[in-house]
């Protein structure tokens, strides 16, 4: 998965750590692309708005889902107030929803932010349902 490249393409602060949990043998290209875009947007937000020093990206592969967690140590924000007008957050939510997934945001002022995108995996060609 290209998350390492995404993390390395973000110059300067914050420090980005990428973790993988599970096996990504057959991740469909449309899901990988959506997760990469969500990760890019989350990293951009952490850099521009959160003044984060550290961000941890974790991709977790389960038999029926793949999840991306992006956690930063930035200034945090009121997720309820920003959610309706934040274009980047709306874009991330739309990418997850387009693939039947969800995007959840947990943040409070002064507490950093945690973003979770969970997308269901569809059986590939020749795979038993």
Language-model segment annotations:
Residues 1-129:
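Coiled-coil dimerization/phosphotransfer module
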């Amino acid at each position: 998965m290209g998350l390492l490249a995404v993390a390395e393409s973000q110059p300067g602060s914050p420090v980005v750590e990428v973790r993988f949990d599970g096996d990504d043998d057959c991740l469909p290209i449309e899901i990988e692309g959506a997760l990469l875009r969500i990760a890019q947007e989350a990293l951009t937000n952490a850099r521009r708005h959160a003044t984060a020093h550290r961000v941890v990206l974790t991709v977790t592969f389960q038999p029926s889902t793949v999840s991306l967690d992006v956690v930063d140590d930035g200034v945090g924000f009121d997720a309820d107030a920003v959610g309706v007008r934040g274009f980047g957050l709306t874009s991330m939510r739309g990418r997850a929803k387009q693939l039947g997934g969800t995007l959840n945001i947990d943040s409070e002022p002064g507490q950093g932010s945690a973003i979770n995108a969970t997308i269901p995996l569809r059986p590939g060609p020749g795979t038993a349902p």
